[in-house]
């Protein structure tokens, strides 16, 4: 049994998962410590509030409210579970976007801009084609594919700059992020898609339901009544599986990873490295565009376009998801669900206590920093393994070798030295 456990522990994947779990535990511990310190030092909070805050951080997804006595109650909260799945959808897709680029040795910090490009294209298509002429399901499909295409084209820009001009993709992505933000603002400003029917929604775009277009619930609303969940989470999971197969079961995936390991060695082996860079960033952009597309095709959320001075957090949270998942497509699913769970816990923390929901941002920040150091943890584990590895025994001398090596006692000194 011990030998089996030892063999499992020696696997690189096991140590990667262990490093991520350790990052999560330390992040939760730090968040709990912050809650405790604030609760014990604040004049408006108490130690009881601190204990309730810690409970909500760990069990916020299962919180059902407070009873008549004011105590927290826990159980299956269908609305919280469904909303967690809804919020996890863009996180999974932006996490995949970052992970695919990482596999090719690229840092896609431009997921936010690609997310905006996909959102813009999706909303224009979904709200411009009249559902009285074209079936709503077909409009949805065209809008979703259009969002992916817009994200792919926007992601291809830093890919082309990297492949053809060797411009650092981080710099190119940062620039394209803000170009996308201002371009989207201008396009919506001159459009007729602004919500003018509701005076309280100035600066917002109509929901896609205004044109009768929305993502199908696929029966999930019956499992999680009272929530915003829809079939987008299933689409995100399917795309994650497709990316996993692409990277691990195809020649193209091998070429992408070969370029990520060593671009010049891959070129020497006959792989078209420039094409891999452009296609990798295009795929990453398509996934980020799909994230924005599914989020707003849900019909649950209005897009705020006016004076866009902040990039969507989903693009940057995708970096945290990819780091936590160690860039594994299947791991991205679980990492996205975990990050979404923290988001729900933060909302419960705000609704049921006097704490601020941004405490969960502290937890996420700690987890991201530790996840970035997970490689050091793995290297440390590898070092310990090498130290514990027994040295191979010296080879036994061949029969008769000892006799051949012994000098002849009757020989002269010069002959003995020659024999030695």
Task: Locate predicted features.
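Cytosolic-side transmembrane-helix boundaries in multi-pass membrane proteins
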Residues: 1-27, 32, 36-37, 51, ...
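Short, non-helical or kinked segments that cap or interrupt transmembrane helices
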Residues: 41-45, 49, 102-121, 163-172, ...
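Transmembrane alpha-helical segments in multi-pass inner-membrane proteins
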Residues: 282-365
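Helix-loop-helix "hairpin" substructures at the membrane interface of multi-pass membrane proteins
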Residues: 224-302, 330
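Transmembrane helix-bundle core of multi-pass membrane transporters
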Residues: 177-249, 417
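Membrane-interfacial amphipathic/re-entrant helices at transmembrane-helix boundaries
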Residues: 2-93, 138
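Hydrophobic core segments of alpha-helical transmembrane domains in multi-pass membrane transport
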Residues: 19-36, 91-98, 119, 123-125, ...
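Single transmembrane alpha-helix segments in multi-pass membrane proteins
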Residues: 35-40, 59-129, 144-148, 152-167, ...
């Amino acid at each position: 049994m011990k030998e089996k456990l030892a063999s499992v522990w020696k696997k690189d994947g096991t140590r990667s998962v262990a490093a991520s779990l350790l990052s999560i535990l330390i992040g939760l511990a730090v968040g709990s410590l912050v809650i405790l310190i604030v609760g014990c030092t604040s004049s408006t909070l108490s130690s009881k509030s601190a204990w309730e805050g810690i409970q909500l951080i760990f069990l916020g997804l299962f919180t059902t409210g407070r009873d008549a006595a004011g105590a927290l109650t826990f159980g299956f909260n269908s609305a919280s579970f469904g909303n967690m799945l809804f919020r996890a959808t863009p996180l999974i897709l932006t996490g995949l976007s970052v992970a695919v680029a990482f596999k090719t040795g690229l840092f896609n910090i431009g997921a936010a801009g690609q997310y905006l490009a996909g959102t813009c294209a999706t909303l224009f298509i979904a709200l411009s084609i009249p559902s009285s002429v074209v079936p709503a399901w077909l409009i949805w499909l065209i809008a979703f594919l259009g969002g992916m295409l817009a994200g792919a084209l926007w992601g291809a820009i830093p890919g082309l700059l990297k492949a053809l001009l060797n411009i650092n993709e981080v710099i190119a992505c940062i620039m394209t992020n803000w170009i996308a933000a201002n371009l989207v603002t201008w396009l919506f400003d001159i459009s007729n898609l602004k919500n003018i029917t509701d005076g309280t929604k100035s600066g917002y775009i109509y929901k896609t339901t205004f044109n009768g277009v929305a993502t199908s619930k696929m029966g999930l609303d019956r499992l999680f009544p009272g929530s915003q969940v829809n079939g987008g989470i299933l689409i995100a999971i399917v795309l994650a599986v497709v990316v996993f197969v692409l990277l691990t079961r195809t020649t193209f995936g091998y070429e992408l990873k070969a370029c990520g390991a060593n671009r010049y060695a891959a070129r020497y082996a006959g792989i078209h490295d420039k094409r891999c860079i452009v296609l990798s960033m295009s795929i990453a952009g398509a996934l980020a565009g799909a994230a924005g597309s599914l989020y707003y095709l849900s019909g649950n959320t209005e897009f705020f376009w006016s004076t866009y001075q902040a990039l969507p957090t989903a693009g940057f949270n995708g970096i945290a998801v990819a780091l936590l998942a160690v860039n594994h497509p299947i791991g991205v699913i679980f990492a996205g669900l975990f990050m979404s769970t923290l988001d729900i816990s933060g909302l419960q923390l705000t609704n049921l206590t006097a704490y601020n929901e941004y405490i969960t941002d502290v937890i996420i920040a700690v987890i991201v920093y530790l996840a970035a150091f997970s490689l050091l943890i793995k290297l440390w584990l590898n070092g310990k393994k090498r130290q514990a590895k027994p040295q191979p025994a010296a080879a036994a001398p061949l029969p008769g070798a000892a006799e051949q090596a012994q000098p002849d006692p009757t020989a002269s000194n010069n002959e003995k030295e020659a024999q030695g």
